[in-house]
Amino acid sequence: MKKMIIHGGKRLSGELTIGGAKNSTVALIPAAILADTPVQFDTVPHILDVHNLRLILESMNVHSTFENDVLTIDPTNIEESELPSHAIKSLRASYYFMGALLGRFNRATVTFPGGDNIGPRPIDQHIKGFKALGANVVEENDSVFISTGTEGLHGARIFLDVVSVGATINIILAAVKAHGTTTIENAAKEPEIIDLATFLNNMGAKIRGAGTDVIRIEGVPALHSRATHTIIPDRIETGTYLSLAASIGDGILLKNVIPEHMESFTAKLVEMGVDLQINEDSIYVPRSNDLDPIRVKTMTYPGFATDLQQPITPLLLRANGSSVVIDTIYPQRTQHVEQLRKMGADIRVQDNLIVVGHSSHLQGAHVEAGEIRSGAALMIAGLAASGVTEISRADNILRGYDRVIDKLHTLGADVEIAADEEVPEN
């Protein structure tokens, strides 16, 4: 494992460019195996999840190259094979291979995926969707075996009991080549779902309604890539750096941003008193001084993203009063709380609420990044704190943030990644 070493306590300034969306990328890469031609993606983030997904592709004889932010994937000689468990178990989004393999081969075997430990994220809605499409699903030990009869998959009406990004994407992947029309009701509306649908439609798929709560998929026999697909900017990375800029910035410009995707987040910053300058594809954050406390409640898109409730926490510590965070999506997403307390933060969990008090002075400490977004919160806090902060399990941060060390260096941060001898590899 790796650790992040931060010499904090100084103001940062400059500009940086937001990378492609992680949550799009981890769906688009499995989707590529549905194509009958090579496919190409641009603005691909340099994150560990991409590396692990490429390992999974290689195990199926799907070759890929990754140069200058461009990822080329050639699925024309794909072979069914057992997917590498070490790569599957390291990232949650590997479950998208269930839908993609089902769409390609009418069968799939996938080990239960890993990823962040932030409480239960069941796949029952995925299974419900596959069964509605005509698949037989068997769960055994830590694996899922999915198969169809000789008729293959067929269109169906599927009502999701809960709004689920993962289930919406997996059903799209399975249904895009199925016979007939599939309707997903109570579908997730995230921009990453629109991005996936755009990619598939440009290859000949017939998907309507992405971005609304009703998505209709008319199955097609084949998909052929015609052009490079540019991945949308990462709204979670954007929000993380907005929080950093408002916390410890002395004027920071974020480029390659879609402001419409950030409205629930930027509205909260404005409510705090941050003087954002929002342009067509960039956001400038001047130095922020007196900040008001706020109440944050996570919701499905277009509400406040659960992935941003931890990264905004270091900013809430600067507010003149107590802020409250309610995570309705993953109430157990509180790993950052105890770690921030080690740095002197006035923060606690109380009756499923996170109460964040004014903390004028954070002190560097040894802390642990239990998952991606708690790691981002600790990173911002470490940059704000006086002294040295060491974040163990920093691989979790590298999993989700594109070239994070390089970007922090461009802002003037004193930060580095080093081997962590005390934490063994998984």
Curated annotation (Swiss-Prot):
Function: Cell wall formation. Adds enolpyruvyl to UDP-N-acetylglucosamine.
Database matches in Pfam families: EPSP_synthase (PF00275)
UniProt keyword annotation of Cell cycle present: yes
Superkingdom field: Bacteria
Gene Ontology cellular component annotations, sorted alphabetically: cytoplasm
Gene Ontology biological process terms, A to Z: cell division; cell wall organization; peptidoglycan biosynthetic process; regulation of cell shape; UDP-N-acetylgalactosamine biosynthetic process
Reaction equations catalysed: phosphoenolpyruvate + UDP-N-acetyl-alpha-D-glucosamine = UDP-N-acetyl-3-O-(1-carboxyvinyl)-alpha-D-glucosamine + phosphate
Record organism: Lactiplantibacillus plantarum (strain ATCC BAA-793 / NCIMB 8826 / WCFS1)
Root EC class: transferase
Gene that this polypeptide is encoded by: murA2
Localization of this protein: Cytoplasm
Record's keyword terms, sorted: Cell cycle, Cell division, Cell shape, Cell wall biogenesis/degradation, Cytoplasm, Peptidoglycan synthesis, Transferase
Disulfide bonds: none
Active site residues according to the UniProt entry: 116 (proton donor)
Entries under InterPro entries matching the protein: Enolpyruvate_Tfrase_dom, Enolpyruvate_Tfrase_sf, MurA_subfamily, RNA3'P_cycl/enolpyr_Trfase_a/b, UDP_GlcNAc_COvinyl_MurA
E.C. number: 2.5.1.7
Residues that bind phosphoenolpyruvate: 22-23
Binding annotation for UDP-N-acetyl-alpha-D-glucosamine: 92, 121-125, 307, 329
Listed name of the protein: UDP-N-acetylglucosamine 1-carboxyvinyltransferase 2
Pathway participation: Cell wall biogenesis; peptidoglycan biosynthesis
Similarity comment: family membership: Belongs to the EPSP synthase family. MurA subfamily.
